[in-house]
């Protein structure tokens, strides 16, 4: 059976991973909604019956085929060659940085020290410069162990002029696709959903043709907040699960959890207009096992998510969660292959891929344009 072979492949991945422990950490989870269970069962049945072979999914036999060790605290090993960061530069990079400073706008690109900042801001291969704008201030109410954004229980109140400033700035840059994200604002009655909605609506009013991806927090699972943002006019509703189900409490803030994030993605699919894509992202190299990754992918796909991205966890400072291992480009490629077999419409997977990834945005834009052309 295909699914049996599929599981064998995941088992082989586990054997290839050098830093996997003999007993993985598990957590007790709440039973998933019946709809999710039905979707998961249907996905597994389809994988068991389909004919395309997955024998090439993972055949990583050498010691370094799946990952490379990071060394010890006293004797760290150098990063592998594929993790070398490019230096930011170029005329467009300078222009965007200057404009952001003038308008006092924040980008997650800088706050989170994204390794792709140079490529995205300078235009990269597609020639279109992009920046992921962070609204609701630069201070988060949560403290996830992987994130470099500063935190506070009582951050400054949101700037009431920010939605207008952000919309006008982005509209003037001549972009076709933009990502708007935010810090968590548990201190606000509506978790910041109203501010998010206003920003999207103002930008769409100024430039209706622009495609907008909203990378949102979980709003503590509040359905009204999710519905409000889902119906704001966005084209892609994104919310990141960040890591496998078993490592949620070790990686994310205690107010976040796997089920809550899946529920948010499912609600967005229900509330958003037809044709709106849902998207999520996961980091590798946090101590997860390949089998846990596969199971997480199954549940995400069963929740109706259209797009999934995989990237390497990179420690922003010594006070943050350490990297457990560097996953090889070959292993990332295999996860992409499996994701497409599962039925995701698009999967971006690579060491330097982040949830707001320029190449992925370019592909998603093409996909949305194609969908709309076909339906017109």
Curated annotation (Swiss-Prot):
Residue stretches making up the Radical SAM core domain: 125-345
GO molecular function: 4 iron, 4 sulfur cluster binding; lipoate synthase activity; metal ion binding
Regions crossing the membrane: none
SUPFAM superfamilies named in the record: Radical SAM enzymes
Cofactor binding annotation: Binds 2 [4Fe-4S] clusters per subunit. One cluster is coordinated with 3 cysteines and an exchangeable S-adenosyl-L-methionine.
UniProt KW keywords: 4Fe-4S, Iron, Iron-sulfur, Metal-binding, Mitochondrion, S-adenosyl-L-methionine, Transferase
Reactions this protein catalyses: [[Fe-S] cluster scaffold protein carrying a second [4Fe-4S](2+) cluster] + N(6)-octanoyl-L-lysyl-[protein] + 2 oxidized [2Fe-2S]-[ferredoxin] + 2 S-adenosyl-L-methionine + 4 H(+) = [[Fe-S] cluster scaffold protein] + N(6)-[(R)-dihydrolipoyl]-L-lysyl-[protein] + 4 Fe(3+) + 2 hydrogen sulfide + 2 5'-deoxyadenosine + 2 L-methionine + 2 reduced [2Fe-2S]-[ferredoxin]
Domain of life assignment: Eukaryota
Miscellaneous remark of the record: This protein may be expected to contain an N-terminal transit peptide but none has been predicted.
UniProt-recorded name of the protein: Lipoyl synthase 2, mitochondrial
Taxonomic source organism: Pisum sativum
């Amino acid at each position: 059976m295909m699914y049996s072979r599929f599981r064998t492949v995941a088992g082989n991945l586990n054997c290839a991973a050098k830093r996997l422990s003999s007993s993985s950490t598990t957590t007790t989870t709440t039973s998933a909604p019946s709809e999710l269970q039905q979707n998961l069962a249907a996905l597994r049945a389809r994988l068991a019956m389909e004919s395309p072979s997955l024998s090439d999914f993972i055949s990583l036999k050498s010691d370094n085929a799946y990952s490379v060790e990071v060394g010890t605290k006293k004797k760290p090993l150098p990063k592998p060659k594929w993790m070398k960061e490019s230096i930011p530069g170029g005329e467009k990079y300078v222009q965007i940085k200057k404009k952001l400073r003038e308008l006092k706008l924040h980008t997650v690109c800088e706050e989170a020290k994204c390794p792709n900042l140079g490529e995205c801001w300078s235009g990269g291969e597609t020639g279109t410069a992009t920046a992921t704008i962070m609204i609701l201030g630069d201070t988060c109410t949560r403290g996830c162990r992987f994130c470099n954004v500063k935190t506070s229980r009582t951050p400054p109140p949101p700037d009431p002029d920010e939605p207008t400033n952000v919309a006008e700035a982005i509209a003037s840059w001549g972009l076709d696709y933009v990502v708007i994200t935010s810090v968590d604002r548990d201190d606000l009655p509506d978790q910041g959903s109203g501010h998010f909605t206003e920003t999207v609506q103002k930008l769409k009013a100024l430039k209706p043709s622009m495609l907008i991806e909203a990378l949102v927090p979980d709003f503590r699972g509040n359905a009204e907040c999710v519905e409000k943002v889902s119906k704001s006019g966005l084209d892609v509703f994104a919310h990141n699960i960040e890591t496998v189900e078993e490592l949620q409490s070790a990686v994310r803030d205690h107010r976040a959890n796997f089920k809550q994030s899946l529920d948010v993605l499912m609600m967005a699919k229900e509330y958003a207009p037809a044709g709106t894509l849902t998207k999520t992202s996961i980091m590798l190299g946090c101590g997860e096992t390949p089998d846990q990754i596969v199971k997480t992918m199954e549940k995400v796909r069963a929740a109706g998510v259209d797009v999934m991205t995989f990237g390497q966890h990179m420690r922003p400072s010594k006070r943050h969660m350490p990297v457990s291992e560097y996953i090889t480009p070959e292993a990332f490629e295999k996860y992409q292959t499996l994701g497409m077999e599962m039925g995701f419409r698009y999967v971006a997977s690579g060491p330097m891929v982040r949830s707001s990834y320029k190449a992925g945005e370019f592909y998603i834009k093409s996909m949305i344009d194609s969908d709309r052309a076909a339906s017109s």
